[in-house]
From Swiss-Prot:
Effect of inactivating the gene: Elimination of the C-terminal half by transposon insertion or gene deletion causes synthesis of an altered structural O-polysaccharide consisting only of alpha-1,2-linked mannose.
Domain observations: Composed of two domains of similar size, connected by an alpha-helix chain. Both N- and C-terminal domains are required for the synthesis of the complete E.coli O9a polysaccharide.
Name of this protein: Serotype-specific mannosyltransferase WbdA
Cross-referenced Pfam families: Glycos_transf_1 (PF00534)
Species per Swiss-Prot/TrEMBL record: Escherichia coli
Keywords: Cell inner membrane, Cell membrane, Glycosyltransferase, Membrane, Transferase
Chief localisation class: membrane
Length: 815
C-alpha cells in the first residue's frame, strides 16, 4: 500500500519514518523496499531507548518516552499528515506509534485492518496485560483525524464499535502484488513441487494460520463429508505452518471424522514462489474463515486463476464477490455442498475460474492509493492551517513529559538525551567525518596513512557544501570521538577537545585508514550510527592478505577475514582505490556467501588516489648526505624502488637482477627507498653488508617527502616489481614527475598505466634484468613508453572523486 501511495503521490512529498530501535537488518529491509522510490533524504529514522514492549511492566516508562521521542522526530520532519499503517502493535516488541492527545501541527491517519480482538474479547483479550494494552491503544486510535479501513466490513466495525464518527472513516480497500498471476509452469517445475511437498496430481488447497477463527476444523469436517471418490481424487493440501502438538491434534480430529492421515497434506512454510505455484496448480481453493478484515488469500488465489470458495461473512463477500461461490462457515454441510458442486459441476467450475480473474482485476494497489490520497486531500482541505513554529513547542512539551516519567533510570535518560538530539533533524547540520583512527594514534607514514592525511587535508581545505567536515577516531572500548587534538597539531585553527561524536541523519563517516584491528568490536558503533540514519563508508586499499596470506603477518591474516566480512555485512559503501580491487572485493564476497551475509543496501565502487606530494601534507628536510646521494644518482643510470620492504614487493628479485647486471659490468645504480617491513630480515641483513652498498646500491630509510621528490626527479626510471597492490602510489608519483616506469604486469598496474609503462613478467632475476636492458635501449632511442601520459589525479581531484562515491546530499537550490 505504502509503495503505491508514493508512486501515485504526484506533487505531494512523501517521507517514511523508521523505528531506530529495530535491529539494523530490519532497518536495511525497510530502506531496501523503498530505495527505488525515495531518496535517502526522505527516509527518516527516529531514535529512542529500548526495550519498550508493553508486555513487561518495567518497559512502560521507556514506552511513553519512546512515543515522546517519536513525536519530536515527527515535529522536526514537519509533515502535514502522519499515516500509520499498523497501529495495534508494540505489545511484544519495540514497535512504537501513538496519537498525541494535545494539539500538534500534523494530522494522524490510521489504517484499520480489523477490530477482531475487540469483537472477540474472550478469545483474544483474556490476558489482562494484553487487554490493557489493546484497550489503551483503542482509546488512542479513536483520537485519529481519519481512519482508512481496508474493507467496508472493517469500516463498519469502526463505526459501530468505537466512538469514531462515520465521516472520519473511509474504505480504501486492499490488493495484492503483481507477482500473483496466472503462470504456465514447466513439467520440471511442477514435478519439483510435487516432490518437495508430496503433492498429488490434483488437490484442494487451503491457506491460513492455526487459530480458531480460521475454522480449519470445520473445513476438515466438511471435507470428510464429501463422497469417497472425491476425497480419493482430491486430497486436501493445507498450506499451514503448524507446531508438532497442533499437527497431532488436527490429525486426530481428522481420524475422528473417518479420514486417514494421508488424506491431509501439510506443506509447512511456503516461499512466495511456491505459494503462487500452488495457487496456480490447485483444483480448488477454499477459505472458511469466521472473521477477516479483508482476506488476502482468496484474492491471491483468484489472481492466480484458482477456482475460489469462501465464507459469506465479514469482509469476504467484498473480496470473492459472488454469492454462489460462498458458504456459511458455521455450517459444515453448506461448506461440503459448495465444495462438492465445484468438484462435480463442470459448468459451475468454469464459471468459478472465469469469475476469479474478473473479480480479482477490480483490486489494485493503485486504486487503493488513489482513494487514500483523495482522503488525505479532503482531510487537509477541511483543516485549519497549522503554524510550523509549533514544532518547537512539541519538542518542549515532550521533553517536559519525559522529565516526569519516574520509571526511567539515569541510563535511560542519558540515552533519551542522545535520541532527542538525533531526532532534532531541523537543528542538525550534516557532518562528513573522516575516520583517522590509526593516523590519530600513530602516523607511521605508510602509503595508506599518506592517503588519509591527503584526503583529510583536501576535504578540510575545500569543504563540502552543506556539511561540516571534521576528523574522528575510535579507541577500543570507548566510542567515536572528534580528532580535534590531532587537527590542532597539524592544521591551522582551534578545534576544541576530543568530544564524543553524535551521529545523526545523513551524516557520513568515511574511513580512509585501515582499521582491521578494530573489528569486530567496531560493528556495534557502525550499526548504532546507521540506526541513527548516518552512513558508514570505508575505503578498501586491497585485500591481498585474503588472496595471498603468505604475504602478511599472522595478525593480519587473522584480522582480515573478520574485517572484510564485517564491512560486507554492516557498511553502506565500500570504496576501493582501483577497479581491480573493487572487482576483487565483489568476487570475495560472492565466494563467501555461505558465511558472509552482505548488507543488501551496500554498493562497492572505486576511485583513484592522488599523487601530488605537495598536497599530501608532506614531510620536509634533507639528509646530511643528500648532495652525495644526488651526485651518485647523476653519475650513472639510476633506478629507484619506493615502498616499505615486504616479501611481495619484489626487492629480492630486483636486487638479484642488478647483481647479474653488475657482474656483467653494467654501471647502473639501484636506490631502494623504504623502511624494513615484515619477514625481510635476511634480505635487509644482506643489504646492510652488501659489497655495493653506497657504491651502486643505496638503501634509504625514513627520508622526507621533500627528498623523495628530489630522487624521483633525478632517477632514470622507477622499478615497481610488486606482485600485488591495491593501487600503487609510487607509480602515480613517478608519472607526475615524468619519471619512466618499469613495472610488473599485474592487473592494477595495467589499469592505471595502460600502454604508458614498460612491463615485465616472471619471477626470475633475469626477467627484471632483461626488462631493464630492453627499456634502456628504447630510452637511448627516445622510444620508451612515456609515463607522463598516465592519467593521474591531484589529491584535490582524488578527494572530489571520492565524494562522488559517498552518499552526499546536494544543498537545496535557492528559490
Amino acid at each position: 500500500m505504502s509503495r503505491a501511495i508514493i508512486e501515485n503521490a504526484g506533487e505531494h512529498r512523501v517521507s517514511i519514518l523508521i523505528n531506530g530501535m529495530y535491529p539494523i537488518d530490519n532497518i536495511n529491509d525497510v530502506k531496501m523496499a523503498y530505495r527505488d522510490l525515495l531518496t535517502d533524504e526522505d527516509m527518516f529514522i527516529f531514535s529512542a531507548v529500548a526495550p519498550t514492549a508493553y508486555r513487561h511492566i518495567e518497559n512502560h516508562g521507556r514506552s511513553k518516552a519512546a512515543q515522546a521521542a517519536r513525536d519530536i522526530a515527527i515535529a522536526n520532519i514537519a509533515p502535514d499528515i502522519v499515516y500509520v499503517i499498523s497501529f495495534f502493535e508494540g505489545h511484544s516488541d519495540s514497535y512504537t506509534v501513538s496519537i498525541p492527545a494535545d494539539n500538534v501541527p500534523w494530522k494522524t491517519v490510521c489504517v484499520c485492518h480489523d477490530l477482531i480482538p475487540l469483537l472477540n474479547k474472550e478469545r483474544y483479550l483474556g490476558d489482562p496485560n494484553f487487554r490493557e494494552f489493546y484497550m489503551n491503544k483503542l482509546a488512542e486510535f479513536e483520537r485519529a483525524d481519519a481512519i482508512f479501513a481496508i474493507s467496508q466490513s472493517a469500516a463498519q466495525e469502526v463505526i459501530e464499535y468505537t466512538d469514531i464518527a462515520s465521516d472520519r472513516v473511509l474504505n480504501i480497500s486492499s490488493a495484492v502484488g503483481e507477482e500473483f498471476a496466472v503462470i504456465d509452469y514447466s513439467a520440471e517445475r511442477i514435478q519439483s513441487l510435487k516432490d518437495k511437498y508430496s503433492l498429488p496430481d490434483e488437490f484442494i488447497l487451503s491457506l491460513a494460520m492455526i487459530e480458531p477463527r480460521k475454522n480449519i476444523e470445520a473445513l476438515i469436517h466438511a471435507y470428510s463429508l464429501l463422497p469417497a471418490e472425491l476425497q480419493q481424487r482430491y486430497p486436501m493440501v493445507l498450506a499451514y505452518k503448524v507446531q508438532p502438538e497442533q499437527l497431532e491434534r488436527i490429525l486426530r480430529l481428522a481420524e475422528s471424522y473417518g479420514l486417514s492421515r494421508s488424506q491431509l497434506i501439510f506443506t509447512g512454510f511456503l516461499t512466495d514462489d511456491d505459494l503462487i505455484a500452488l495457487y496456480n496448480l490447485c483444483k480448488l481453493f477454499v477459505f472458511p474463515s469466521l472473521h477477516e478484515g479483508f482476506g488476502l488469500p482468496p484474492l491471491e488465489a483468484m489472481r492466480c486463476g484458482a477456482a475460489t470458495l469462501g465464507s459469506n461473512i465479514t469482509s469476504l463477500p467484498e473480496v470473492i464477490g459472488w454469492e454462489d461461490a460462498m458458504f456459511n462457515p458455521h455450517d459444515v454441510q453448506d461448506i461440503r455442498r459448495v465444495m462438492e458442486k465445484a468438484l462435480t459441476d463442470e459448468a459451475f467450475y468454469r464459471e468459478l475460474k472465469a469469475h476469479a480473474l474478473a473479480q480479482s482485476a477490480k483490486f489494485s494497489w493503485a486504486n487503493t492509493a488513489h482513494l487514500a490520497i483523495e482522503g488525505f486531500t479532503r482531510l487537509l482541505q477541511s483543516s485549519q492551517e497549522t503554524d510550523a513554529g509549533q514544532a518547537e513547542s512539541v519538542t518542549a512539551s515532550r521533553l517536559q513529559m519525559m522529565q516526569k516519567i519516574d520509571a526511567l533510570s539515569e541510563v535511560d535518560r542519558l540515552g533519551l538525551a542522545w535520541a532527542v538530539a538525533r531526532n532534532s533533524f531541523k537543528r542538525h547540520t550534516r557532518k562528513l567525518l573522516v575516520d583517522i583512527s590509526v593516523l590519530a594514534h600513530d602516523d607511521a607514514k605508510t602509503g595508506i596513512q599518506r592517503v588519509s592525511r591527503s584526503i583529510l587535508s583536501e576535504l578540510l581545505k575545500s569543504g563540502v557544501p552543506g556539511y561540516e567536515v571534521s576528523a574522528v577516531y575510535y579507541t577500543p572500548g570507548e566510542c567515536y570521538r572528534y580528532a580535534n587534538q590531532y587537527l590542532s597539531s597539524h592544521f591551522p585553527g582551534e578545534f576544541g577537545a576530543d568530544e564524543p561524536v553524535l551521529f545523526s541523519k545523513d551524516d557520513v563517516l568515511i574511513a580512509t585508514d585501515l582499521t582491521a584491528h578494530l573489528f569486530p568490536e567496531l560493528v556495534t558503533q557502525i550499526d548504532s550510527m546507521r540506526a541513527a540514519g548516518a552512513f558508514a563508508c570505508f575505503v578498501v586499499h586491497d585485500i591481498l592478505p585474503l588472496r595471498r596470506p603468505e604475504w602478511s603477518i599472522e595478525g593480519i591474516q587473522r584480522d582480515f577475514p573478520i574485517w572484510l566480512s564485517c564491512l560486507a555485512e554492516h557498511a553502506d559503501r565500500l570504496i576501493c582505490v582501483s577497479a581491480s580491487v573493487a572487482e576483487d572485493v565483489k568476487a570475495w564476497i560472492a565466494e563467501n556467501r555461505h558465511w558472509v551475509k552482505p548488507n543488501p543496501l551496500q554498493t562497492v565502487s572505486n576511485f583513484h588516489l592522488g599523487a601530488d606530494l605537495d598536497a599530501s601534507v608532506p614531510s620536509t628536510g634533507m639528509p646530511d648526505n643528500a648532495q652525495a646521494l644526488l651526485a651518485a644518482m647523476a653519475a650513472a643510470p639510476s633506478f629507484i624502488m619506493v615502498g616499505t620492504m615486504e616479501p611481495r614487493k619484489g626487492h629480492a628479485q630486483t636486487l638479484a637482477a642488478f647483481e647479474e647486471l653488475w657482474r656483467e659490468g653494467k654501471d647502473y645504480n639501484l636506490f631502494i627507498v623504504g623502511k624494513q617491513g615484515w619477514n625481510v630480515d635476511s634480505l635487509c641483513e644482506k643489504l646492510r653488508h652488501h659489497p655495493q652498498l653506497n657504491k651502486k646500491l643505496f638503501w634509504l630509510q625514513n627520508i622526507s617527502d621533500e627528498f623523495l621528490a628530489e630522487l624521483y626527479a633525478r632517477s632514470r626510471a622507477l622499478i615497481f616489481a610488486s606482485q600485488g597492490e591495491g593501487f600503487g602510489l609510487p607509480l602515480i608519483e613517478a608519472a607526475q614527475k615524468k619519471l619512466p616506469v618499469i613495472i610488473r604486469d599485474i592487473p592494477v598496474f595495467k589499469e592505471i598505466a595502460q600502454e604508458h609503462a614498460w612491463y615485465f613478467s616472471g619471477e626470475a632475476p633475469s626477467d627484471i634484468a632483461k626488462a631493464v636492458e630492453e627499456w634502456l635501449a628504447l630510452y637511448e632511442q627516445n622510444a620508451h613508453p612515456r609515463s607522463e601520459n598516465i592519467n593521474w589525479l591531484t589529491w584535490k581531484q582524488s578527494a572530489e572523486f571520492l565524494l562522488k562515491n559517498l552518499p552526499i546530499i546536494a544543498p537545496a537550490a535557492k528559490q
